């Protein structure tokens, strides 16, 4: 079973590598960085493993420790249980620690190592103790981060030449992203705390660096004296209007270039008038030919029966199943109501797991 699932994983990895290799030139022609392809491949693999369709069964062990031999003697069995209880009590006493007023509280957290961690670090399936020091008086601060703030930092790092990973370029341009804008306290204000305004902008504005051009110093200074709710509303309306105007200008610029730079409408009209005179006779001949062809096609077509109708209910019943096999038929044999199938080169999904095979046989009766 593990060998079959390993083969499935190899097939999926081969497909991923083939797709990434074939689209690499197209991405490079569009100016997309090579790192984006590598991230796409890694995300694809992570989603494949997260689906658990090709989850590998863990190794049973390295074989260095033989399985324990359990005797049928009840006395020896009781003695073994007593030794196990003593060992557990000793472990509990060792791990116990006193907690004082100014002391730190330590906890042992058992993390179950995955198959990948076990293979890399040499630790088989077990509990890995990790000690965490947490001060009872000064807990560690939490730093919440949002997707928009992360994208802003990455975009700033990319503009300053730090060589960050262009994750913003991989987003859908029409996706709406929240962006947090921090306003300093206005001059002469009693409170020195800064305010955070949240606006919604499409990802295309972040990809094309339009937001930094819209948020000018004059705009920020004009809304600093407004309340937080009103300032957010005014800023959102200004950004929406600016983005709409920019998109409208792009549409007009693209429409102007459709006919070409040196095109003349007068010449087109004169040529069209001459062409209309010459093509009147040709249109009449084409209409006659089309009518004759339609009559011939109508005579050859057979009338449809009710059995030929395709309804949505049939397709829903066909694919409403938990187990699916996609393969090629080698041959089919039948003896009365017993059928035998010989399949080849297929993949099947059984109970949420994927399996590949070169040859397979199946029996059915109906």
From Swiss-Prot:
Name of the coding gene: TfIIA-L
SMART domains attached to this UniProt entry: TFIIA
Record family assignment: Belongs to the TFIIA subunit 1 family.
Low complexity composition bias: residue spans: 146-162
GO BP: transcription by RNA polymerase II; transcription initiation at RNA polymerase II promoter
SUPFAM superfamilies assigned to the protein according to its UniProt record, in alphabetical order: Transcription factor IIA (TFIIA), alpha-helical domain, Transcription factor IIA (TFIIA), beta-barrel domain
Organism, as annotated: Drosophila melanogaster (Fruit fly)
Residue stretches of biased makeup (Acidic residues): 264-317
Modifications after synthesis and translation: The precursor form (48 kDa) is cleaved to give rise to the alpha (30 kDa) and beta (20 kDa) subunits.
Function comment: TFIIA is a component of the transcription machinery of RNA polymerase II and plays an important role in transcriptional activation. TFIIA in a complex with TBP mediates transcriptional activity.
Taxonomy, superkingdom: Eukaryota
Main localization, broad class: nucleus
Protein name as annotated: Transcription initiation factor IIA subunit 1
GO molecular function, a single term: TFIID-class transcription factor complex binding
Modification Phosphoserine occurs at: 265, 306
Any one Gene Ontology cellular component term annotated for this protein: transcription factor TFIIA complex
Listed Pfam families: TFIIA (PF03153)
């Amino acid at each position: 079973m593990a060998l079959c699932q390993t083969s499935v994983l190899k097939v999926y990895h081969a497909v991923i590598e083939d797709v990434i290799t074939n689209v690499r030139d197209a991405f490079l022609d569009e100016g997309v960085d090579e790192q984006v392809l590598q991230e796409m491949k890694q995300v694809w693999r992570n989603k494949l493993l997260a689906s658990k369709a090709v989850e590998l069964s863990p190794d049973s062990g390295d074989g260095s420790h033989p399985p324990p031999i359990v005797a049928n003697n009840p006395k020896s069995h009781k003695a073994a249980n007593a030794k196990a209880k003593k060992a557990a009590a000793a472990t509990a006493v060792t791990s116990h620690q006193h907690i004082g007023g100014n002391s730190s509280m330590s906890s042992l957290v058992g993390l179950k190592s995955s198959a990948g961690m076990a293979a890399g670090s040499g630790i088989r399936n077990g509990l890995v103790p990790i000690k965490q020091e947490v001060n009872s008086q000064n807990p560690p601060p939490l730093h919440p981060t949002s997707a928009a703030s992360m994208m802003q930092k990455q975009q700033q790092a990319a503009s300053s030449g730090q060589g960050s990973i262009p994750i913003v370029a991989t987003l859908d341009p029409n996706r709406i992203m929240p962006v947090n804008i921090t306003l300093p306290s206005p001059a002469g204000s009693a409170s020195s705390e800064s305010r955070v305004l949240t606006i919604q902008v499409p990802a295309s504005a972040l990809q094309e660096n339009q937001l930094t051009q819209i948020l000018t110093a004059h705009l920020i200074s004009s809304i600093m004296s407004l309340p937080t709710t009103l300032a957010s509303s005014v800023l959102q309306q200004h950004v929406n209007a600016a983005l709409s105007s920019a998109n409208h200008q792009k549409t007009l610029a693209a429409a102007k270039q459709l006919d070409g730079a040196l095109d003349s409408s007068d010449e087109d009209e004169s040529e069209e008038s001459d062409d209309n005179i010459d093509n009147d006779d040709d249109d009449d001949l084409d209409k006659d030919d089309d009518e004759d062809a339609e009559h011939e096609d109508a005579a050859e077509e057979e009338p449809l029966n009710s059995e030929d109708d395709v309804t949505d209910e049939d397709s829903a019943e066909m694919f409403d199943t938990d187990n699916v096999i996609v393969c090629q038929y080698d041959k089919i044999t039948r003896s009365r109501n017993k059928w035998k199938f010989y399949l080849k080169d297929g993949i099947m999904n059984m109970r949420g797991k994927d399996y590949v095979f070169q040859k397979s046989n199946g029996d059915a009766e109906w």
